[in-house]
Amino acid sequence: MRARAILALPLVLAATALTPHAAAADAGVAALQVGLHARGLYKGPIDGISGPATAKAIRKLQARARIEVDGVVGPKTRRALGRFARHRLGSRPLATGKTGWDVASLQFQLAEHGFPSGAFDGIFGPRIEAAVKRFQEWADLEVDGIAGASTLAALAAPPPTIPFPLAWPLTAPVLGDLFGPRSDHWHSGVDFPAPSGTPVYAARSGQVVWAGWREGGWGFLVTVAHGRGERTMYAHLSRIDVRVGVWIGQGVKVGLVGASGHATGPHLHFEVRVRGAAVDPMRALPET
């Protein structure tokens, strides 16, 4: 697990764009990365950012296809990507069995909105269908598992955020993996590596709605509800110190750091949900 102290220099994500202007994460770039990864040419994260690794992979693809090596994704380069270059997002309804650029773009947009569907692979299978249904329910759309015009329009809106501030769940937090792209999938929370037995504190007052073992890799988990569908989640604990149904205040100890569930080492996995959508906790935590 990558770790970085929050008292160190500010975290900066820098990338060299393929165009003269720096760009934020883009679902189309993520789809390109998925296609390059499928061809064995791109080993970086599927992060939707045009950086040096993406540019290098494009040139490798062009050289392999014996077309002009200019780093520009034009029609010939798209054809060289094969099935993963077909179908722009919005050109057709997406459902189980579909494959292509648009499916990979859809996966990335779903993840950005808090509904990841496993590895980014551009193949519409059961996990993408389930994520589409969860998003449709969240967005008050018809729940049919098909990503048509209304679903894509809703995904074009900004991702949700938590509407109130949070406190740090550890007294001396060190940042590990952040919310967002990690390798070929999406990390839905923030990891805080810490020694086993380190106290974990409620980031906001609320009612405990889960306190126990949870399958799916969570291990010992505490979930606290905060009102209108907002929840904070504290996973991989070694001990739980609260009970379901109890109202707790901000700063109350909920348990101890551990490595229960699917964890490579002792750390707190801290997750925030808004009506089921995973949102970036760092946007609500205090600046250091």
Which residues make up each language-model segment?
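Surface-exposed, glycine-biased beta-strand/turn segments
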Residues: 157-219, 250, 259, 279, ...
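Polar/charged, compositionally biased leader and regulatory segments
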Residues: 123, 129-130, 134-138, 142, ...
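Conserved hydrophobic/aromatic packing and binding residues within compact polymer-binding modules
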Residues: 58-61, 132, 251-254
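Acidic, Ser/Thr/Pro/Gly-enriched interdomain connector segments
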Residues: 2-4, 9-48, 82-122, 196
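Conserved, short, structured surface segments that act as functional micro-motifs
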Residues: 221-230, 244-288
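Intrinsically disordered, low-complexity Ser/Thr-rich linker and spacer segments
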Residues: 75, 79-105, 112, 149, ...
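Zn2+-dependent peptidoglycan hydrolase active-site motif and core
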Residues: 187, 202-241, 266-271
